[in-house]
From Swiss-Prot:
It comes from the Bacteria. The lineage of its organism: Bacteria, Pseudomonadati, Pseudomonadota, Alphaproteobacteria, Sphingomonadales. InterPro entries: Ribosomal_uS4, Ribosomal_uS4_bac-type, Ribosomal_uS4_CS, Ribosomal_uS4_N, S4_RNA-bd, S4_RNA-bd_sf. SUPFAM superfamilies: Alpha-L RNA-binding motif. The gene is rpsD. The keyword RNA-binding applies. It comes from Erythrobacter litoralis (strain HTCC2594). One of the primary rRNA binding proteins, it binds directly to 16S rRNA where it nucleates assembly of the body of the 30S subunit. With S5 and S12 plays an important role in translational accuracy. This is Small ribosomal subunit protein uS4. Residues 94-154 form the S4 RNA-binding domain. Keywords: Ribonucleoprotein, Ribosomal protein, RNA-binding, rRNA-binding. Residues 1-49 are annotated as: Disordered. One of its GO terms (molecular function) is rRNA binding. GO terms for biological process: ribosomal small subunit biogenesis; translation. The keyword Ribosomal protein applies.
Length: 204
């Protein structure tokens, strides 16, 4: 098991929130951070602390992408026209592993990344094994034949707590079309995300 995968629920505990909305998150039983001092009452958080927390939560939600990747995505968002926070969300939602997750081809973001890495995902009929690959509007993302019978894919498609968002249009159980780049209020986050604070963090 990778370090990132084993730590996924540690992020839930640290944030005190069920980041991915999973029924088996330990936060459903306790809302304090990990470790023996997790239950201590916290004082008022500084502006920097709030900004850092917002960045850690958003970065963690997308499969704990590396700081280098996240900063590069932010830099691209800041060069685009319009609101930088909205641009950042749009770029993150265009990641191939995220579209695979949204399509319910994988039960978790981490599993979606694994499926892509192992060559089970096709974009417009071409095998693509780069999780961070940018999906464009109109692209068709499909499962390879072997993936259709994988237990984790079948598990993902049966999860009642997750719905496929409007900007990912399904065609059967093994194919979706990315129809548009979503805005913040269209993304089905189980918790509140604050990209404006992420912008403030990187603008210091």
């Amino acid at each position: 098991m990778s370090k990132r995968k084993s730590a996924k629920y540690k992020l839930d505990r640290r944030m005190g929130e069920n980041i991915w909305g999973r029924p088996n998150s330990p936060v459903n039983k306790r809302s304090y951070g990990p470790g023996q001092h997790g239950q201590r009452r916290k004082g008022k958080t500084s502006d920097f602390g709030l900004q850092l927390r917002a960045k850690q939560k958003l970065k963690g939600y997308y499969g704990d992408v590396t700081e280098k990747q996240f900063r590069r995505t932010y830099a691209e968002a800041s060069r685009m026209k319009g609101d930088t926070g909205q641009n950042l969300i749009g770029l993150l939602e265009q990641r191939l592993d995220m579209v695979v997750y949204r399509a319910k081809f994988a039960p978790t973001v981490f599993a979606a990344r694994q499926i892509v890495n192992h060559g089970h995902i096709y974009v417009n009929g071409v095998k693509t094994n780069i999780p961070s690959a940018r999906v464009k509007v109109g692209d068709v993302i499909s499962l390879g034949n072997k993936a259709k019978e994988m237990a984790l894919v079948i598990e993902a498609q049966s999860l009642p707590e997750r719905e496929i968002p409007d900007y990912v249009a399904p065609d059967g159980n093994d194919k979706v079309t990315f129809t548009r780049v979503p805005k913040l209020d269209e993304v089905p986050y189980p918790v509140t995300m604050e990209p404006n604070l992420v912008v403030e963090f990187y603008s210091r």
